[in-house]
Each structure stands twice: as C-alpha cells, then as structure tokens.
C-alpha cells in the first residue's frame, strides 16, 4: 500500500511538472523564423540558454498568448476611438489624428509581460524566476542604434542614436501637427518604462533616450477637450507592447 502511494505521488509530481512547463518561440537577432523551446519550467530555463548569452536584455520582450490577444483587442479599440475622434474634428485636427492613427495601425504589438529578463537578475531577484505555464514568445537581439520618433510630428520614423542628445534635440527639426503637445513629449524606453520629458523653451529639461527608445509627441490638453490624457495613456500602453524591430 505504501509502495503504491509513493508511485502515485511520483506520477502526480511528474504530471504536474509536465503541465507546468512552457513552450516558447524565440526570435533572435532579427530573424523572421522562430526556434521553439519546450519544457521550460521557469524563466531561467529560457533566458539562461547559452545561445542567448550575447543578447541585449534591456530591449528583450517576452509575451504570453492570452495577453497578446488582449493587446490586439486594445489596439483595435484605440484605432476605433481615434477614428471617431477624427470624424468629429476640424480638417487640420482630423488630418493630424489620421496621421497618428496610421502610425498606430502599423505597429505590431504583443502581450508583453512586465518582468526583467536579464539572466543575472532572474537568478537572484525575489520572484524574478517565475514558472512558465502556457505559450510564450521571446524577442531578443543586439543593441539597437536608433531611436524612433512617433506621434503628431511631420516626419515620424527612425533617427540615428547620438550619445548625449536629448529629447528636445531629436525633435528640433520636426514640425508639430495640429493639436500636438508643444510642452512635453514622452520617452518609451526599450524595457517598457515611460518618462514625460519637458521640451518647451520655458520648461525644457535634459532627458536622454537610450538606443531603441520611442519619442512620442502626443495630444495637447489645451487643444483636445475629449480626455486627451486617457488617449495618450492608451497610446503609450500600446507603444510599450510593440514588438522589437
């Protein structure tokens, strides 16, 4: 009887371990083809892989299947809200909103998990090595060499990263579209953090983005009466869930 109980317990533990293990698709170094890792029971089983040893972890992104579905729904809801906002606006404002909407529509988003992926942190941090259950996708690669300008500006897109250059300097050659915030921009760092950066002559502060950051020029409170803060927050959330390029 005791022997049967021990065997049953071992089978139960084994089944539990198999159930808990995650399956991860890994995109590395800009490859369009994923390599699949199975049986990853904890995060360190993934980020501790020798083949990922030279990855740039500040910009790495791991997503979970259900969270990705939610992120895609949020992106679509945001696009709908912007379309409605544009339909109720003047010609100049509508053109600006449409330009912003097109940029957001072009984004590829995923259900990013908010956790530090640096293997050294994963090994030692409290709750830094959670179990992996379900289906995940990991994007890792080398350090980027650009920043991305985004939002209500004349020429959105990538710019070469320059050490020491601040947010206001990156925006100095841009024309702002109708309804743009002229006093502040936002920095979305590669690790998902966001920071509000004063950029006007009266409040300018030296804020340096790191390589791989997005500089977002959003909607101005003084121009938009329909909850610009909520729209800006949702846009920033979508930007934090962008798949690394």
Curated annotation (Swiss-Prot):
Pfam families xref list: Caps_syn_GfcC_C, Caps_syn_GfcC_N
Record InterPro entries: Caps_syn_GfcC_N, Caps_synth_GfcC-like_C
UniProt key word Signal: yes
Protease keyword on record: no
Signal sequence residues: 1-20
Segments passing through the bilayer: none
Keywords of this entry: Signal
Family, per entry: To E.coli YmcB.
Annotated protein name in UniProt: Uncharacterized protein YjbG
Gene: yjbG
